[in-house]
UniProtKB/Swiss-Prot annotation:
Produces L-cysteine from O-acetyl-L-serine and hydrogen sulfide. Can also use pyrazole and 3,4-dihydroxypyridine instead of the hydrogen sulfide to produce two plant specific non-protein amino acids beta-pyrazolylalanine and L-mimosine. It comes from Citrullus lanatus. GO terms for molecular function: beta-pyrazolylalanine synthase activity; cysteine synthase activity; L-mimosine synthase activity; pyrazolylalanine synthase activity. One of its GO terms (biological process) is cysteine biosynthetic process from serine. This is Cysteine synthase.
Amino acid sequence: MADAKSTIAKDVTELIGNTPLVYLNRVVDGCVARVAAKLEMMEPCSSVKDRIGYSMISDAENKGLITPGESVLIEPTSGNTGIGLAFIAAAKGYRLIICMPASMSLERRTILRAFGAELVLTDPARGMKGAVQKAEEIKAKTPNSYILQQFENPANPKIHYETTGPEIWRGSGGKIDALVSGIGTGGTVTGAGKYLKEQNPNIKLYGVEPVESAILSGGKPGPHKIQGIGAGFIPGVLDVNLLDEVIQVSSEESIETAKLLALKEGLLVGISSGAAAAAAIRIAKRPENAGKLIVAVFPSFGERYLSTVLFESVKRETENMVFEP
């Protein structure tokens, strides 16, 4: 009897991508369009940023810019890109220094340290700009160091053009009418959006940003609670000309929607997934979208947010529980 072909991955990097799509069923009352979620929480390290962690490191290696065991990698991040880099740095043997605003969840810090990354916290009042500046300072005094620069690095949207976009197109059987994606670096909406519009120019692209920091809508940067989107500046990798519309969602609505996704859909997701879902539901209620298919990208898994406002009430409740005799 012939041996069955082995499907064992050679290492953890081969597990990235090919995440599933699932319809939302119980949070879509009043919607005239169908809403499906692209579950990036099913990546090996539970976020969409696993894709760019891999693509940015591979790209720099292929260009001869970094070498495992020799180069020191540095990156400013709101957390998930740091984790996406950290598990690959661990698998390949890189030293990694992460600069992150102190306002990001405790889970992020713990996971980064578990992968052996060094962590430098920056002033939360200065947002991502403060983390970027700190990374530059560290690079200046660290020999053989390299900043991957997710906000400027073309390898970021490129991986979404090559993988995320085609996966959504195939997964929807070419039936997608609109893509909804929160904008952090803008890599997902730019790369996947460009691919999808090449397949069908009528596909609409919706970016999502916090109402409290609505830069893309001409507003001012400000503090908000939607970790991972709304960096407070327009990233270099974002192609704003691709966007058909930018939807603003408040931190409160994002948090409430994320809670509902757990309670009604069985999907434990992060706050930015709540923002994407809230925007997608809003779009799906517009009469002109009757019968259409809207795909929302859910960037990360809820377990990474247990220490945040998202789970504050249930956490308090569980901490105060006593056993029954």
